[in-house]
């Protein structure tokens, strides 16, 4: 197992140019790509803020999930090659929004973005989601139960 804590990485999360003009990746982002390439199962654990992922996570994706690494456009074609095929993923998402509200009223925008627009676009499947909430009203016993559930999923490789 390899572990990345985005807050500990040294990188500029702002994508300042298009793909063709991108500067070289910082060493921590090179290592992140190596870790993703090495893995057969990816686990993303993060809070849901304003319906989606935190800005730092989005910046990480913008800088790491790149053409030539995670996908490849086909010259003159609408389709693309999914270079992360053969991998699965689990999203562990905490939230203060009640999960039924997030699903049925808001439409799960953050989950959909990660499942389809990021990981699915690159060939990662299946992408399973475990959500934990409402955090701010949860008891220590409930949070302990959530941690055990996440640990059980990890032990099962799911």
Predicted stretch roles:
Residues 1-69, 137-158:
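N-terminal beta1-alpha1-beta2 submodule of the flavodoxin-like/Rossmannoid cofactor-binding fold
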Residues 6-13, 82, 87-90, 116-135:
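Mobile beta-alpha loop/short-helix "lid" or hinge segments that flank ligand
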Residues 67-72, 124-128:
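Short, structured loop/turn "capping" segments at alpha-beta junctions
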Residues 72-121:
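Short, glycine-/small-residue-rich phosphate/pyrophosphate-handling segment
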Residues 104-158:
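Glycine-rich phosphate/pyrophosphate-binding loop and the adjoining helix
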């Amino acid at each position: 197992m390899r572990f990345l804590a985005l807050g500990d990485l040294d990188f500029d999360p702002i994508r300042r140019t298009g793909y063709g003009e991108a500067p070289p990746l910082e060493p921590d982002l090179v290592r992140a790509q190596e870790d993703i390439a090495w893995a057969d199962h990816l686990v993303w654990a993060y809070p849901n803020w304003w319906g989606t992922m935190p800005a730092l996570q989005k910046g990480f994706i913008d800088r790491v999930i790149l053409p030539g690494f995670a996908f490849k456009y086909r010259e003159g074609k609408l389709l693309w090659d999914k270079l992360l095929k053969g991998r699965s993923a689990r999203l562990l998402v905490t939230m203060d929004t009640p999960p039924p509200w997030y699903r049925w009223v808001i439409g799960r925008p953050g989950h959909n973005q990660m499942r389809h627009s990021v990981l699915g676009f690159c060939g990662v499947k299946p992408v399973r989601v475990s959500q934990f909430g409402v955090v701010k009203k949860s008891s220590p016993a409930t949070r302990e139960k959530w941690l055990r559930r996440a640990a059980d999923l990890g032990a099962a490789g799911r």
